[in-house]
Amino acid sequence: MLASYASDPLKSRGRLYKEIPTSYRNEFERDRDRIIHTNAFRRLQYKTQVFINHEGDHYRNRLTHSLEVSTVARSVASTLNLSNDLAETIALAHDLGHTPFGHAGERALNECMREYNGFSHNAQSLKILTLLEKRYAAYNGVNLTWEVLEGIVKHNGPILGEINEYIAEYNKQNDLELSTYASAEAQIAALADDISYISHDLEDSIGAKIIDFNSLAELKYIDQHVVELKSKFKNISSSCLIYEVVRKLIHELITDLLWQTKENLNKEKITNIDEIRNLNYQIVDFTEKTNKNIKETKKFLHERVYKSNKITAISLKCTKIVQGLFKIYMDDINLLPVNWKMLIDSNETYSKARVVADYIAGMTDRFAIQEYNQLCSTSYITCF
């Protein structure tokens, strides 16, 4: 049974365009299925998480990452008697707006769009789901419930101060109450993202030999698991060791998240979802100690992995591709596919830049490379 403060699909605020409910799926299950059937979701399998798809078959991509986040989110929500369908759905959609080549691609595209209000993958996720996906005759987008869209837009909490242009535009027709916190399920999806990416980026980085087990000594709360496992299993292989460490880390983080969230719910005597939205802090959270550990881990990954020679060299090439494609299309808009060119409002530069950014953001890594090579055939980029 759902808690009184859960997001009940039977009490959903509904969809922008009214639809008749189905008898065999609740509203959040319908949204999950709609997301899975989008082109944007399928393209995630060829978009970078940390390592370019060509680097190896076992490294995570945006699709596998999204699936892993969704399993964590669903488990946590179920344990707290919240809507596991909503938590899972938001988790599956949270990375839809990412560019090719991960954060390097996003930084490059944001720099290209500096004069045109920038680029945000979070806002791009909303744009994909409410405008760019063309699957229904009656409307653009996939017409998701209010609760799912709220959770995607408020992935990092309430939106205060300057608001992204597309989010502000959409909010005029479907008020997502940007200044409040999202549902508990959405908060779970956001922290499930943290749990998944810090754990699995560590795993992939060791697999890629960017870091080793000795370097994990900097993270004492993780290193203790390494020491314990080596002591217990004298002949444990490196591949098995990292799997065991990651498994323990994920369990530890989830357990901590559940404990602290239950404490917060009891302390605030939460009885309904509006109380969660109107609190002055996030109800779903880790303990103070674990938040500190997570912050240290993110710093470690940033310094030792994302800024490593290997990742920096790849990022440089990725930046060249994204910025090169942007310039090429802006210089000659006729190189865009006809259906994209039709989206431009006359030949106005701002509109042209936004359409070009939308087109590039939707590319997979391999399509971006192929397109760049085709348009710049004198200098093929093949050494990924």
UniProtKB/Swiss-Prot annotation:
GO terms for biological process: dGTP catabolic process. InterPro entries: dGTPase, dGTPase-like, dNTPase_2, HD/PDEase_dom, HD_domain, PHydrolase_assoc_dom. Pfam families: HD, HD_assoc. Keywords: Hydrolase. Signal peptide: none annotated. GO terms for molecular function: dGTPase activity. Residues 62-198 form the HD domain. Belongs to the dGTPase family. Type 2 subfamily. This is Deoxyguanosinetriphosphate triphosphohydrolase-like protein. It comes from Rickettsia peacockii (strain Rustic).
